[in-house]
């Protein structure tokens, strides 16, 4: 895979100032958010639940960076992320609702593993600067944790960035020269790392539990 130097330069430069342009919300109340998050649990807490069309796994939200989730909800509400169900749901939530729900979902933010699982494919070199070597240590809270996410969801997200369905100029530049085979390799690697969990696990333990716990 060839990634254009200009795209990488833009990615790094904008990434370093990403925090300044993120849409921050009020401090969240995780206790209230746990109640409000029942609306999320119906899809994101069901094992093996998939979006109908196109077909892909509904993403894991447990342990995800709260600021990233707030930005995602804002994107769904505003139409920058096209998804009818999520648009309808996000549009009903106030700024405080979003802050509370995401505070609960973040719980204890996923921490990097002491040892990376497997050998990272060369294509992940374009991901680690922002998402970390195992996808669990992001350079800022507005970037998503990838570790433990469903591989097919990661592929779907990358495809949407490439097609422009998800409006993000940074990611659009990064994935422009990446093919489907590379998408799958990236997704499989990050998906097998310790990381995110379903809202069902989060409700039971108030955090994403490691296999050894």
Annotated model-derived regions:
Residues 1-4:
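N-terminal secretory signal peptides that target proteins for export/translocation
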Residues 19-25:
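Sec/Tat signal peptide C-region and signal peptidase I cleavage site
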């Amino acid at each position: 895979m060839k990634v254009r130097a200009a795209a990488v330069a833009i990615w790094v430069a904008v990434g370093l100032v990403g925090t300044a342009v993120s849409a921050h919300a009020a401090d969240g109340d995780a206790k209230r958010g746990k109640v409000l998050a029942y609306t999320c649990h119906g899809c994101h807490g069901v094992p093996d639940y998939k979006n109908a069309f196109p077909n892909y796994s509904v993403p894991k939200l447990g342990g995800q960076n709260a600021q990233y989730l707030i930005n995602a909800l804002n994107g769904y509400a505003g139409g920058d992320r096209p998804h009818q169900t999520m648009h309808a749901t996000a549009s009903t939530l106030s700024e405080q609702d979003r802050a509370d729900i995401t505070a609960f979902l973040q719980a204890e933010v996923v921490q990097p593993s002491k040892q990376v699982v497997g050998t990272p494919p060369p294509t992940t070199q374009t991901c680690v600067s922002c998402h970390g070597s195992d996808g669990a240590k992001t350079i800022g809270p507005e970037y998503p944790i990838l570790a433990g996410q469903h591989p097919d969801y990661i592929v779907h997200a990358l495809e949407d960035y490439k097609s422009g369905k998800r409006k993000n100029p940074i990611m659009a530049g990064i994935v422009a020269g990446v093919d489907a085979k590379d998408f799958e390799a990236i997704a499989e690697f990050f998906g097998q790392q310790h990381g995110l969990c379903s809202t069902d696990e989060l409700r039971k333990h108030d955090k994403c539990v490691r296999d050894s716990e």
